[in-house]
Curated annotation (Swiss-Prot):
Protein name: Valerianol synthase TPS1E
Gene behind this protein: TPS1E
Domain commentary: The Asp-Asp-Xaa-Xaa-Asp/Glu (DDXXD/E) motif is important for the catalytic activity, presumably through binding to Mg(2+).
Note on cofactor: Binds 3 Mg(2+) ions per subunit.
Gene3D superfamilies linked to this entry: Farnesyl Diphosphate Synthase (1.10.600.10), Terpene synthase, N-terminal domain (1.50.10.130)
List of residues binding Mg(2+) 3: 452, 456, 460
Organism: Camellia hiemalis (Camellia)
């Protein structure tokens, strides 16, 4: 990842040639520097939300509703983004529904696929056999399916919960995409349904940013003739109130970052405070996790600048000094560093000290050590890539991935994310679980690493960069770039299968923790879907504005 010294130095004081990336600047100026929370509006939203929550809670636990109606209610609550208010009630209902589920011949494709998706999302391993009745004697999908747009859409979304060995869901995925794409814009779909289909094809429910997908669904649900006005009202109020909270938090983070003034000392680095907070909000959006969002954002910002230092500025000799300093984690190590690295190193130590003090007040600072160790590990792996780049070495794909699963930040992000959760959820055992290199964390890291390798490949190679996974695979297997991309995306899909399998019961740790790893995987899908949206933030600018600035009209 490092820039190397190119050419001979004229003398010992000459500045080495550096492969500067010339990253796009921050988009935001002082846009998020100030924000005053409207307390009156906040209280107004909050008072009505509490009333509506009790009404909806009564709906969830009320008896007499058919299973299909109950599963649909749970689906609507989740897609509207308000299910986090009713987690206990929903889990109790799903446990009963799964225990009593029968493959009723009266259930249509929409209902079966909905059951499958909801059960799988909550860890219940429903068999793919429930879809057998939608295949003919030759094993082909029945022709009547093509006319059931809602059923096809429901099945399409369900296929994203597949695990390894479920060939039927692979076939169903390809089939539903082909059918839905052929219907978009045609005479058989209303404009509203066509809009839903187009959005689903662009972004699935399971891999989407939860809060953004909730906002999209609210706009669709509002046009649904069968909508429940109580649910719709609660969803709008909840989104807008939580948006106010997030906007206030973002203002605090943005000001903190400006006051830290690190970018002025390392101007080669990406200035991405807003984007890092956006990322953290995907990991956990719920109001009680405000400390976690701040902690994760700060650590991500430091890692981002560290990444750019190894990737686009530091010489190999400078980077070795920095790696050693991080391993020591002691202020005295600063004396050995170049001036620009001193600023970064000082910020690293100070921010972790600040985070540790804040978490100690709540009795949950025991995770900080694990985060520091993960940071040290990443820096060691950055140095390995720096050496590869200096030597012009193209590693085997296996050797590359062994190192890349560290630089993908899966362990660091997961550890830092857990630090922001309640002590009774993120226990010492949870942090020890991360040390076992669990399949889910590795899969999450692989998704982020491989999709980034594909999306940023051309730009990175143009300026000079260590061989990526794409390059390593091409060389080792003697294939074209396009062929290698196909293979890497197969690996990404298998990583998603592993994540889906890891959330099936019985799980290694609490689902409240696993959902955070899933969310960290989701943000990779959103940010790197078509291009590197972190390096080029204009790609996700509309998402940021939608999430933090634009309220839903009441």
């Amino acid at each position: 990842m490092a820039s190397s010294q190119v050419g001979d130095m004229v003398n010992g004081n000459a500045e080495p040639t550096r492969h500067l990336a010339k990253f796009p600047p921050s988009l935001w100026g002082d846009r998020f520097t100030s924000f005053t929370l409207d307390k009156q509006l906040w209280d107004k939203y909050g008072n009505e939300i509490e009333v509506l929550k009790e009404q909806v809670r009564s709906m969830v636990v009320a008896g007499g509703r058919k299973a299909a109606e109950q599963i649909n209610l749970i689906n609507v609550l989740e897609r509207l983004g308000v299910s986090y208010h009713f987690e206990k009630e929903i889990e109790e209902q799903l446990e009963q529904l799964f225990a009593k589920f029968e493959d009723n011949e009266d259930y249509d494709l929409f209902t079966i696929a909905l059951h499958f998706r909801i059960f799988r999302q909550h860890g219940y391993k429903m068999s793919c056999d429930v879809f057998n009745k939608f295949r003919d004697s030759n094993g082909e999908f029945k022709e009547t399916m093509s006319n059931d747009v809602q059923g096809m859409l429901s099945l399409y979304e369900a296929t994203y919960l597949k695990i390894r060995g479920e060939g039927f869901l692979d076939e169903a995925h390809a089939f539903t995409i082909a059918q839905l794409e052929s219907l978009v814009g045609g005479p058989h779909l209303s404009s509203d349904l066509s809009e839903q289909v187009m959005h689903a094809l662009k972004q699935s429910i399971h891999r989407g940013f939860p809060r953004l997908e909730a906002k999209h669904f609210i706009s669709f649900y509002e046009k649904d003739a069968s909508r429940n006005e109580t649910l719709l009202r609660l969803a709008k109020l909840d989104f807008n109130q939580l948006q106010l909270s997030h906007r206030e938090e973002l203002c605090h983070i943005f000001r903190w970052w400006k006051e830290l003034d690190l970018i002025s000392k390392v101007p080669y680095a990406r200035d991405r405070a807003v984007e890092c907070f956006f990322w953290s909000t995907c990991a956990y959006y719920e109001p009680q996790h405000f400390v976690g969002r701040a902690v994760l954002t700060k650590i991500m910002l430091l890692l981002s600048v560290t990444d750019d230092t190894y990737d686009a500025y530091g010489t190999y000799d400078e980077l070795k000094l920095y790696t050693n300093a991080v391993q020591r984690w002691d202020v005295s190590a600063m004396d050995e560093l170049p001036d620009y690295m001193k600023a970064l190193y000082r910020a690293l130590l100070n921010v972790y000290d600040e985070v540790e003090r804040d978490l100690a007040k709540q009795g949950r600072d025991y995770g900080v050590h694990h985060s520091k160790e993960a940071f040290k590990e990443i820096v060691r792996s950055y140095e390995i890539e720096a050496e590869w780049f200096k030597e012009g070495y193209v590693a085997s794909f296996e050797a590359y991935m062994k190192n890349a699963l560290v630089t993908s930040t899966g362990r660091l992000h997961t550890t830092s994310c857990f630090m922001g959760l309640e002590a009774d959820v993120a226990t010492t055992e949870a942090f020890e679980w991360i040390l076992t290199k669990p399949k889910m964390v590795a899969a999450s890291g692989a998704i982020g690493r491989l999709v980034d390798d594909v999306m940023s490949h051309d730009e990175e190679q143009e300026r000079g960069h260590v061989a990526t996974g794409l390059d390593c695979y091409m060389k080792q297997h003697g294939v074209s770039k396009q062929e290698a991309i196909v293979e890497l995306y197969k690996m990404i899909e298998n990583a998603w299968r592993d994540i889906n399998e890891e959330i099936l019961k019985p799980t290694a740790i609490s689902m409240k923790l696993l959902i955070r790893v899933l969310n960290l995987s989701r943000i990779s899908d959103v940010v790197y879907k078509y291009v590197d949206g972190y390096t080029h933030p204009e790609i996700i600018k509309d998402h940021v504005i939608s999430l933090f600035e634009d309220p839903i009209p009441m």
